[in-house]
């Protein structure tokens, strides 16, 4: 060691792990970091794989928080739910940044390994589908995509039949005494939610008297945050796809950019957007 070289290792730092769990063992890094298996020899396929795997990890956390928030709202514990939903929004903002990295992939680079994907596509992401279900956008026909894996198909079937975040938010309105139409309360929750005048009237009253309905107002704003971030994610997705493959058909069989543009018009919480015009 050179005389002017400083020792940066503190005396108390643990170095003997013969009988103790290490950082890598706790995070199962051997398994995690060996999951990036390229199907081509092209350098940039690693970027493509890592971006999508990282997004799936973030989506796992989103589902963890959304499901917990739904249970909290069911139990009238809105304050803990607010923290969970705020965390979801932060995660969404993080995922959006990943499109900047993927956009460094040029069309010429992508076509070098695109055929290796076969028919695999982000459209088949079961976690993204479960997020849509948790937010209330139910698509029963999409379950066919997952028939290859019976266990996964069963999980999605359960998610399809579970009340969404918006379903429990509407129940919170009912508990506060708002008269919500019975057709909304008894609807088939396996189908996409359709806006309702009584739900809109309830939210309008919440926004008109924020002090009286503070918790419901906060819940509504948390929902708006999540949908806002999701729409930003969808827009960045669409523009990144357009930048890389133009208007070619997607690997999953969709029309590509044209399909992604149509998706931008989907609303999860329509009445919460409508009240902004009505106030």
From Swiss-Prot:
Entry binding sites for substrate: 48-52, 110, 114, 251
SUPFAM superfamilies, sorted: Indolic compounds 2,3-dioxygenase-like
InterPro entries: Trp/Indoleamine_2_3_dOase-like (IPR037217), Trp_2-3-dOase_bac (IPR017485), Trp_2_3_dOase (IPR004981)
Residues at which heme binds: 237
Any single Pfam family the record assigns to this protein: Trp_dioxygenase
Pathway stated in the Swiss-Prot or TrEMBL entry: Amino-acid degradation; L-tryptophan degradation via kynurenine pathway; L-kynurenine from L-tryptophan: step 1/2
Catalytic activity entry: L-tryptophan + O2 = N-formyl-L-kynurenine
Cofactor notes: Binds 1 heme group per subunit.
Key words, A-Z: Dioxygenase, Heme, Iron, Metal-binding, Oxidoreductase, Tryptophan catabolism
GO biological process, one term: L-tryptophan catabolic process to kynurenine
EC code: 1.13.11.11
GO molecular function: heme binding; metal ion binding; tryptophan 2,3-dioxygenase activity
Reported function: Heme-dependent dioxygenase that catalyzes the oxidative cleavage of the L-tryptophan (L-Trp) pyrrole ring and converts L-tryptophan to N-formyl-L-kynurenine. Catalyzes the oxidative cleavage of the indole moiety.
Protein name: Tryptophan 2,3-dioxygenase
